[in-house]
Swiss-Prot record:
<feature type="active site" description="Charge relay system">
    <location>
        <position position="122"/>
    </location>
</feature>
<feature type="active site" description="Charge relay system">
    <location>
        <position position="197"/>
    </location>
</feature>
<comment type="function">
    <text>Amidase; part of the Fusarium detoxification of benzoxazolinone cluster 2 (FDB2) involved in the degradation of benzoxazolinones produced by the host plant. Maize, wheat, and rye produce the 2 benzoxazinone phytoanticipins 2,4-dihy-droxy-7-methoxy-1,4-benzoxazin-3-one (DIMBOA) and 2,4-dihydroxy-1,4-benzoxazin-3-one (DIBOA) that, due to their inherent instability once released, spontaneously degrade to the more stable corresponding benzoxazolinones, 6-methoxy-2-benzoxazolinone (MBOA) and 2-benzoxazolinone (BOA), respectively.</text>
</comment>
<dbReference type="GO" id="GO:0016787">
    <property type="term" value="F:hydrolase activity"/>
</dbReference>
<comment type="pathway">
    <text>Xenobiotic degradation.</text>
</comment>
<dbReference type="InterPro" id="IPR036928">
    <property type="entry name" value="AS_sf"/>
</dbReference>
<keyword id="KW-0378">Hydrolase</keyword>
<feature type="active site" description="Acyl-ester intermediate">
    <location>
        <position position="221"/>
    </location>
</feature>
<feature type="binding site">
    <location>
        <begin position="218"/>
        <end position="221"/>
    </location>
    <ligand>
        <name>substrate</name>
    </ligand>
</feature>
<comment type="similarity">
    <text>Belongs to the amidase family.</text>
</comment>
<dbReference type="Pfam" id="PF01425">
    <property type="entry name" value="Amidase"/>
</dbReference>
<protein>
    <recommendedName>
        <fullName>Amidase 2</fullName>
        <ecNumber>3.5.1.4</ecNumber>
    </recommendedName>
</protein>
<dbReference type="InterPro" id="IPR023631">
    <property type="entry name" value="Amidase_dom"/>
</dbReference>
<feature type="binding site">
    <location>
        <position position="197"/>
    </location>
    <ligand>
        <name>substrate</name>
    </ligand>
</feature>
């Protein structure tokens, strides 16, 4: 981390900072939960409303933007149940909603395609006047001076940001816990994790307290919580959406760039906000982005071409006329090894210095993360980069050369997201299914594939001989009773900059 405020010394005991930050957040929530103002929309359920339905209600004046935002601020009772929020901006949200209603009254139309749509963003996204802490105590009470470009774009489109959501200490873990904001729990069972690192977003969406969430993904941080909560989540290729104004741990590393992406309860919402964000031409304000516009129609043929898939969906896919071929995963272990080398390249210095600046303890998983290895030399780093490029080329060539029995090329891959459903807090250990596509920088979308069957004990699972310690750990986690009925998500993976293509593959007529 390079800016002075990242290393600001906290002179108060860290516990006092935590108490003050949480009290400020809770007061801002309670102000609205205790409001005795009644609106017609109080009786409207927004849990299943998508953007098109909501904007139609707004356009027909069956509900106002103020009513919608008021209803969703009330819905943030989700915080009381799951501890999913960090920063609260209900007052600003209601002020913006009032302006939207006034615009509609004056002009007879909505301000934009996201007019009045309640949105939450992960704690990393800068919003003027609010902290972006990354779960670090030292970053508390250091408000951002301006909105991140993506936040600016969302507001111009009419969206209303209502809150920021929790993440793990440093963001570098697949659960959601930190000493500053505390532990976020799964909406359906407080003993379980909602995943991470965008776990606060997932909890808000599952509880219907937000319609669109925005997260980040450097190893599965969008896809894992979506898998555990029955949601849709897109990890674009890095450089498709702007990361400018989004705080991040390990700032300055370019070997595995983190990606910004949306999370939603429906595919239609996910595709719409991705399209709108790209059509806003983010490269005009972020020099790190290539000018790749949204390409409607370029991948329409995808829906009639073969899919490379596995396991449970094979029968459905074949019945729908798709060719099913087995994918070669032999490169995956090397990709994971390279990723792990990058994660520990600085010997944990970045995270260690950020935690020591605040004085708080490490959560156990991050303590283990920073102790994974010693810092490497510049020469060793170059060798790691050479390995990355070589494996990217090998994977590219393998994809190009793979053919179906009728000699058709592969469109996309169907891949697991995690080796288990939502599990007890502190149990997640392996993210290999997701992070391989961060190193490859491929587009990956997690979608709700169903729920684990209830009361079925698959004896063959216990006959499996674990390949290593982590495999044995995951096997011990398996419980057919507690995992029954839990959400299961799978990944559809395309190649670089195929954000338009991946959603098309998931149209109901194509797979389900």
């Amino acid at each position: 981390m390079t800016t002075s405020k990242d290393t600001t010394k906290v002179h108060k005991p860290w516990t006092e900072v935590v108490t003050e930050k949480r009290a400020l957040r809770d007061a801002r929530i309670d102000k609205h939960l205790k409001s005795d103002i009644k609106f017609p929309s109080d009786g409207i359920s927004f849990e299943t409303v998508d953007i098109d339905v909501l904007t139609s209600l707004l356009r027909d004046r069956k509900v106002s933007a103020v009513e919608v935002i008021h209803a969703h601020s009330r819905a943030c009772e989700a915080q009381k149940q799951t501890n999913c929020l960090t920063e609260i901006c209900f007052d600003d949200a209601l002020e913006q909603a009032t302006q939207l209603d006034e615009f509609q009254q004056e002009h007879g139309q909505l301000m934009g395609p996201l007019h009045g749509v309640p949105v939450t963003v992960k704690d990393q996204f800068n919003i003027r006047g609010l902290d972006s802490t990354l779960g670090y105590v030292a970053k508390a009470f250091s408000p951002a001076e301006s909105d991140a470009p993506l936040v600016q774009t969302l507001k111009k489109l009419g969206a209303v940001i209502i809150a920021k959501t929790n993440l793990p200490q440093s963001i570098m873990w697949c659960e959601t816990n930190n000493p500053l904001w505390g532990l976020t729990t799964h909406p359906e069972d407080p003993k379980l994790t909602p995943g991470g690192s965008s776990g606060g977003e997932a909890a808000m969406l599952l509880m219907g307290a937000s319609i669109i969430g925005w997260g980040t993904d450097i190893g599965g941080s969008i896809r894992i919580p979506c898998h555990m909560n029955g949601l849709w989540g897109l990890k674009p290729s890095s450089g498709r959406l702007s990361y400018r104004g989004v705080e991040v741990t390990l700032e300055g590393q370019q070997h595995i760039p983190s990606a910004v992406g949306p999370m939603a309860r429906s595919l239609s919402c996910l595709k719409l906000v991705t399209k709108l964000a790209i059509e806003a031409e983010p490269w005009a304000i972020d020099p790190q982005l290539p000018p790749v516009p949204w390409r409607d129609g370029i991948f329409q043929a995808t829906s009639t071409r073969p899919l490379s898939v596995f396991r449970d969906l094979v029968t459905k896919l074949e019945a729908a006329g798709h060719e099913v071929i087995e994918w070669d995963s032999s490169l995956n272990s090397s990709i994971i090894d390279i990723m792990d080398g990058y994660y520990s390249a600085d010997g944990g210095e970045d995270i260690r210095s950020a935690v020591s600046a605040g004085g708080e303890p490490f959560i156990p998983q991050i303590q283990a993360f920073v102790n994974r290895g010693e810092p490497i030399s510049v020469f060793e780093y170059w060798q790691l980069n050479k390995r990355k490029i070589a494996i990217q080329e090998a994977y590219h060539d393998m994809w190009d050369n793979k053919r179906s029995p009728t000699s058709r090329p592969v469109d996309v891959l169907l891949v697991p997201t995690m080796p288990h459903t939502a599990v007890p807090h502190g149990s997640c250990r392996w993210t290999g299914y997701t992070k391989i596509f961060n190193l490859l920088d491929y587009t990956a979308l997690t979608f709700p594939a169903g729920k684990a069957p209830r009361g079925e004990n698959d004896g063959s699972f216990w006959e499996h001989v674990p390949r290593n310690e982590v495999d044995a750990w995951n096997q011990r986690l398996y419980d057919p009773v507690t995992m029954g009925g839990r959400h299961v998500g799978l990944q559809i993976v395309g190649r670089r900059f195929e954000e338009e293509k991946v959603p098309i593959v998931l149209k109901p007529k194509c797979i389900f």
